[in-house]
């Protein structure tokens, strides 16, 4: 496995894969639809009725269906940073309440606020559509009234996975950690906005770090 991953990584220009510089690009439609980071994904075309359903990953207070939620311990264990901010929906738009007369916006509460009915945060990375767009500048969802139709490609396997799978294969299948494995870890960690692993760590520490990356 390590040999095949290494071949892909060392020839990423030939294969055409990239690690998007800004992880938030992967959460946006249409930017993410044809991202070269996606190795395998479900492409959707809402104009042809082959669309994904962003309502499945939204809380009920926002008009969602509450089908997919984030496992709570996984959420708590992920290091704070740009990746966590991009991946998880931690704010609930209370669409059933009155809008703010000055901003025209619905109240926005933390997912664990007692006023919500939520016990888990939600995934943010799959829900953007033309009707439901996250404004990163002020941390707010701009909604025209959400639709179940989205043309966003759902990511199943990304180039980031290949980088980490190589690091994992080296960590568990060889006697020592090579420079490429460290480089793969650093690329993923740097983009995630978390501290980079030191080359002085033990093999056991590296194994755990790959699992948590």
Feature map (PLM): residue ranges:
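Elongated scaffold/linker segments in the mid-to-C-terminal portions of large proteins
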Residues: 7-163, 172
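Conserved catalytic neighborhood of penicillin-recognizing serine enzymes
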Residues: 185-213
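Short coil/turn linking the two alpha-helices of tandem helical-hairpin repeats
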Residues: 1, 172-175
């Amino acid at each position: 496995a390590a040999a095949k991953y290494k071949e892909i990584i060392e020839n990423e220009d030939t294969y055409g894969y990239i690690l998007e510089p800004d992880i938030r690009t992967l959460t946006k439609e249409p930017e993410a639809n044809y991202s070269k980071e996606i190795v395998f994904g479900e492409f959707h075309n809402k104009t042809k009725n082959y669309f994904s359903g962003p309502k499945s990953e939204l809380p009920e207070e926002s008009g969602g269906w509450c089908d997919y939620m984030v496992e709570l311990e996984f959420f708590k264990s992920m290091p704070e940073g740009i990746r966590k901010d991009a991946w998880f929906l931690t704010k609930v738009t209370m669409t059933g309440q009155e809008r703010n007369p000055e901003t025209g916006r619905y109240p926005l509460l933390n997912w664990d606020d007692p006023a919500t009915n939520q016990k888990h945060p939600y995934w943010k990375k799959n829900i953007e559509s033309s009707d439901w767009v996250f404004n990163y500048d002020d941390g707010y969802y701009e909604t025209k009234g959400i639709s179940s139709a989205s043309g966003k490609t759902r990511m199943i396997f990304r180039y980031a996975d290949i980088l980490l799978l190589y690091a994992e294969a080296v960590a568990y299948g060889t006697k020592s950690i090579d420079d490429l494995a460290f480089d793969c870890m650093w690329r993923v960690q740097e983009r995630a906005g978390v501290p980079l692993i030191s080359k002085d760590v033990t093999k056991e520490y590296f194994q755990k770090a790959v699992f948590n990356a």
